[in-house]
């Protein structure tokens, strides 16, 4: 009903009808969050990427998100363990990226390569009932169960943070700047509790016999991406990277390209991986005129940005999480 007036904005409608805005907000909202800008005096946020929450407004991390990180970490583990066995995958990825085309089409082709050349041989080790690989039936991931991670303690607050990037343009000093994108984030230091169970009769197929070993794999994957960023940004952000050494995994939609992909692990060298990815970013992912110019501006790493979070007085690398076992079944 509030949006049936001629004005589509809620705030003017409330003022027009002499309603107290703060009072209405308190009644209809089950949570609130402070907003932090990279620098003061910038425009107010428009669209905000929301944090997943329960019906009661408590933030949580879906088990599917955690399992996605585990999935990538397992693939990474085997690529690192037997690099020559998976060396043939890179030329196929390189061909798709260099060829270019529509974003959705390239994404579909790359997903197919990862599924056929990595997921099927590494994870698809259960008895095959059909000619086509079916991850739901054949994947070793069936043997790993992960619950949602629920926030502990009385505080259930979140923060609205402006996107904060540090760019490393070839031949220039590091440039830290805010971008007109805002994300609802979980404050640093918050604790979550979740459970992980492995069925050893299934996970033995990939030589995984304990949860402790699984977390070693996720940490290795996190360290791989952090180390590449540290080569570029480590000297300027020493404290942030010292804290990053404690991370066991990297979570979140804004945590950066390296935490979500395996391309650098598959490339024969960082230099080749960077050049191919720079071309792919320019010709497929970001094709608007006057866009990022990765081919010309990126140095040793594509993308050339470090994702940070700041509340003014404090600053962190975005998405870092550490793990501690509190009970064992």
What feature does the model see in each segment?
Residues 8-54, 61-62, 71-180, 264-268, ...:
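Extended, compositionally biased
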Residues 1-3, 7, 134-329:
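Basic polyanion-binding and macromolecular-assembly surfaces
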